[in-house]
From Swiss-Prot:
The protein's Enzyme Commission number: 1.17.7.3
Superkingdom classification of source: Bacteria
Record-listed [4Fe-4S] cluster binding positions: 280, 283, 315, 322
Organism, as annotated: Thermobifida fusca (strain YX)
Coiled-coil regions, chain positions: none
Family membership: Belongs to the IspG family.
Function as written in the Swiss-Prot or TrEMBL entry: Converts 2C-methyl-D-erythritol 2,4-cyclodiphosphate (ME-2,4cPP) into 1-hydroxy-2-methyl-2-(E)-butenyl 4-diphosphate.
Pathway this chain belongs to: Isoprenoid biosynthesis; isopentenyl diphosphate biosynthesis via DXP pathway; isopentenyl diphosphate from 1-deoxy-D-xylulose 5-phosphate: step 5/6
Protein name per Swiss-Prot or TrEMBL: 4-hydroxy-3-methylbut-2-en-1-yl diphosphate synthase (flavodoxin)
GO molecular function: 4 iron, 4 sulfur cluster binding; 4-hydroxy-3-methylbut-2-en-1-yl diphosphate synthase activity (ferredoxin); 4-hydroxy-3-methylbut-2-enyl-diphosphate synthase activity (flavodoxin); iron ion binding
Reaction catalysed by this enzyme: (2E)-4-hydroxy-3-methylbut-2-enyl diphosphate + oxidized [flavodoxin] + H2O + 2 H(+) = 2-C-methyl-D-erythritol 2,4-cyclic diphosphate + reduced [flavodoxin]
């Protein structure tokens, strides 16, 4: 006799279908449509310092950044744009506030896109026609970047504060102005420091337009706090199929933003996994220094670009099981470590040789994977409990 527990025959898909949107091209990177979700960041240098800015862009590129934004608050910054746009390895977006003249300077400089903030550009609405014409002739998109911290005073007066409704109304109003001039190469962001408000705003926006959406939690905070806020907000939206490009905002070096963004996408299965270090959090059962082992293995394999899962475990309770599930792993205890490859113990080594052995085996497996044509991913680090 069977009992119907009301359970589905098969588990539901964890992610909703991707929201259908228009597609725009930011340089050679497609955003929206069926394009993969891209990861962006923003330089922290003075843009006018061309060498420093290009150096940071190179570091971001190496970290996996696909699109970079640079601030243009002054004439000196605007004058630096042609060289930066030409020499950057990835598409450059000019970030414009206050002065509409810098929008035209950025377009003339060859930037791949321009972000405008309708909340603080002087007489922005009056300039939309000219901006649309210039962007259309250059073949570049415009990001309408609405931010809770610089919302139009009229909307603040209407709603009392930067609500989700206020953010969406601002974005759609500006879109309508561009649409009046036949311009539709638009992507939108509606950023707020509160993930709950931000999630509500993007959900509303997704229901009311088909433009690609740039996800971001503004002023997210220091690295730990900002990572949590962004992971919560992005995870909720991306799981619903909302979002076409992301930027994690952290009070930290920009390359850290990129690493977090990539990790979020990998965690949702939205990007091919790269190197994944799985390590136990350590407890009273641990017979080795798991933290040191995991950090040394991570450092030794930094930059490895194949989807390889390495488990670093500190005891005999979960260690053997986790190590068997990984491509490569170690279960440590009693001054030694059992090295697993594809679930099988291949050797037992002294504790002093664990790191060296894992790195050697990882590099060997990586070479085999490359020879077999396994696609590259992006490096990531995961500490599992």
């Amino acid at each position: 006799m069977s009992v119907d527990l009301g359970m589905p025959v098969a588990p539901p898909q964890p992610l909703a279908p991707r929201r259908k949107t228009r597609q725009v091209m930011v340089g050679n990177v497609p955003v929206g449509g069926d394009a993969p979700i891209s990861v962006q960041s923003m330089t922290t240098t003075v843009t006018a310092d061309i060498n420093a800015t290009l150096q940071q862009i190179a570091e971001l590129t190496a970290a996996g950044c696909q699109i970079v934004r640079v601030a243009v608050p002054s004439a000196d910054d605007a004058e630096a744009l042609p060289i930066i746009a030409k020499k950057s390895q990835i598409p450059v977006i000019a970030d414009i506030h206050f002065q509409p003249k810098y929008v035209f300077a950025a377009i003339d400089a060859g930037c791949a896109a321009v972000r405008v903030n309708p909340g603080n550009i002087k007489k922005f609405d009056d300039k939309v026609g000219e901006i649309a014409k210039a962007a259309s002739e250059a073949g570049i998109p415009i990001r309408i970047g609405v931010n809770a911290g610089s919302l139009d005073k009229r909307l603040l007066a209407k709603y009392g504060k930067a609500t989700a409704e206020a953010l969406v109304e601002s974005a759609l109003w500006e879109c309508s102005l561009f649409e009046e001039h036949g311009f539709h190469d638009i992507k939108i962001s509606v950023k707020h420091h509160d993930p709950v408000v931000m999630i509500r705003a993007y959900r509303m926006l997704a229901e009311r337009c088909d433009y690609p959406l740039h996800l971001g939690v503004t002023e997210a905070g220091p690295a730990f706090q900002g990572t949590i806020k962004s992971a919560v907000a992005f995870g909720a939206l991306l799981a619903e199929g909302i979002g076409d490009t992301i930027r994690v905002s952290l009070s930290a070096p920009p390359a850290e933003e990129v690493k977090v963004g990539i990790q979020i996408l990998e965690s949702l299965g939205l990007r091919q996994r790269g190197l994944e270090i799985v390590s136990c959090p350590s407890c009273g059962r641990a017979q080795v220094d798991v933290y040191t082992l995991a950090n040394r293995v991570t450092a030794g394999l930094e930059g490895l670009d194949v989807p390889l899962r390495v488990a670093v475990m500190g005891c005999v309770v979960n260690g053997p099981g986790e190590a068997r599930e990984a491509d490569l792993g170690v279960a440590s205890g009693n001054g030694k470590g059992q090295i697993f490859v594809k679930g099988k113990v291949i050797k037992t080594v002294p504790e002093s040789q664990i790191v060296e052995t894992l790195i050697e085996e990882a590099l060997r497996i990586a070479e085999e994977m490359r020879a077999e044509g396994v696609p590259s991913g992006q490096p990531s680090v995961d500490v599992a409990g």
